[in-house]
């Protein structure tokens, strides 16, 4: 692997999920072209991947105006999170209240309501290290457990609580990794996301917490691509019996994953300039 440049600041942070410099063609090609077309700007690249083993070596040499490179593998962090020492925690009442406010806003006005986005932003800001919604509380607190049980009873159409529990954990835990990345990222003047998804959430969080411009280039329409992947995926269970299933209806867990990626996209578009 090529040595990674490090810098104290940069002009533009490129937030790249599963693309340049590890994957050739497509998105990576035009990212490479953009960087080389603007030699007057100093770029910082934040690469987001699934697991380190899923990527080989760089397919592109980093241009000279890439002054900083860092990489984060979100599902390796999920595995590390499950290795945290479980211990009794009550949770932060402020953080729990913010999550409940978000759920209430969703129920009252739907996902497109302005109050739902405002409540989501309040939750996102508290995911940062030192915030009221700590990863340890999400994983182990009594308040988190009670809230999870309530959501399962009120909304889950799948009979398996075990699958619901682990789906929610796996789905949401990368957001705390991204919040840590957002807080630790070097100073930049602007942020550019090649897509929505996890990179888009990181971009939205940086724009929100640092008040810097966010540019979004939707290549391939990320959310639709994720929907196609979710329709095809065999690892998402449907535990309903033949009498409970509606052939015309998606399974609950597929709906949950789709709603999650739609929210990441909605947040990024809301914050983009």
Give a label for each model feature.
Residues 17, 48, 218-221:
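Histidine-centered beta-alpha loop that forms part of the nucleotide-sugar donor binding/catalytic region
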């Amino acid at each position: 692997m090529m040595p990674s440049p490090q810098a104290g600041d940069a002009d533009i942070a490129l937030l790249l999920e599963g693309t340049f410099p590890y994957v050739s063609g497509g998105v990576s090609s035009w990212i490479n072209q953009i960087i080389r077309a603007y030699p007057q700007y100093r770029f910082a690249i934040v690469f987001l991947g699934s697991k380190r083993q899923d990527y080989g070596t760089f397919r592109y040499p980093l241009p000279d105006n890439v002054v900083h490179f860092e990489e984060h593998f979100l599902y390796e962090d999920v595995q590390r999170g499950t290795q945290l020492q479980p211990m009794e925690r009550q949770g932060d009442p402020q953080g729990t209240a913010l999550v409940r406010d978000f759920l209430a806003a969703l129920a009252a006005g739907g996902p497109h309501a302005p109050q739902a986005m405002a409540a989501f932003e309040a939750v996102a800001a508290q995911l940062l290290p030192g915030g009221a919604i700590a990863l340890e509380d999400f994983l182990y607190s009594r308040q988190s457990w009670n809230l999870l049980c309530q959501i399962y009873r009120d909304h889950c159409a799948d009979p398996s609580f075990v699958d619901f529990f682990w789906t929610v954990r796996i789905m949401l835990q990368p957001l705390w990794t991204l919040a840590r990345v957002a807080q630790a990222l070097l100073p930049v003047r602007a942020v550019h996301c090649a897509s929505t998804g996890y990179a888009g959430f990181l971009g939205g969080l940086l724009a929100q917490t640092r008040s810097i411009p966010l540019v979004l280039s939707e290549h391939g329409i990320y959310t639709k691509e994720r929907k196609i992947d979710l329709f095809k995926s065999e690892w998402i269970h449907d535990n309903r019996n033949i009498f409970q299933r509606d052939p015309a209806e998606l399974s609950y867990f597929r709906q949950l994953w789709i709603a999650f990626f739609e929210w990441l996209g909605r947040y990024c578009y809301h914050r983009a300039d």
